[in-house]
């Protein structure tokens, strides 16, 4: 048995949801009559987050973040059925279950995360799922991680945060836990993988 705890990011890590996110943003931009550059927007949300993008739009155009977020969330929820699992996700989750590794999710996605997990048949793999509906301070602030550590008496030295953006790696650093990341390079705090099944090789 491997003494580890996995905390997973959701969008772009466990599921391929960026096409749905980009479509929801395009419709949101159109609704508020804003110029939409798909390449630039995709680059921005991969480097930062959708929330940061909407905050920038609020500052640039004077449209309230709440109105932008409400519209974008509605449009994304309407596209949740198009979200699919990332290759290797089930294999890694099954392996983690056999190794008695506890799994959690911490994502900026909203309350519809639960229904997506149910539809994809993976909700039972996770002890708890934290979303934006929990109202923790956003990544990379470690508040949500600290909540899980305290609630479940987790050992930080055993926790790995698995994500796909610099924001996820920064969260792990701020929370003083290990990082495995699909895009960020190797360093003393992070292990880079190119696909999820490489997680097995990290611990086998």
Predicted regions and their residues:
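Asp-based, Mg2+/Mn2+-dependent phosphohydrolase catalytic module
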Residues: 1-4, 30, 94-97, 110, ...
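N-terminal helical cap/lid subdomain that shapes the substrate entry/recognition surface
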Residues: 2-87, 91, 95
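A generic secondary-structure micro-motif detector
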Residues: 15, 43, 82, 103, ...
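Secondary-structure boundary/capping motif
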Residues: 16-17, 105, 114, 140
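Short glycine/serine/threonine/alanine-rich loop segments
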Residues: 34, 63, 101, 154, ...
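Non-catalytic, surface-exposed connector residues within folded enzymatic/regulatory domains
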Residues: 65-69, 83, 107, 138-139, ...
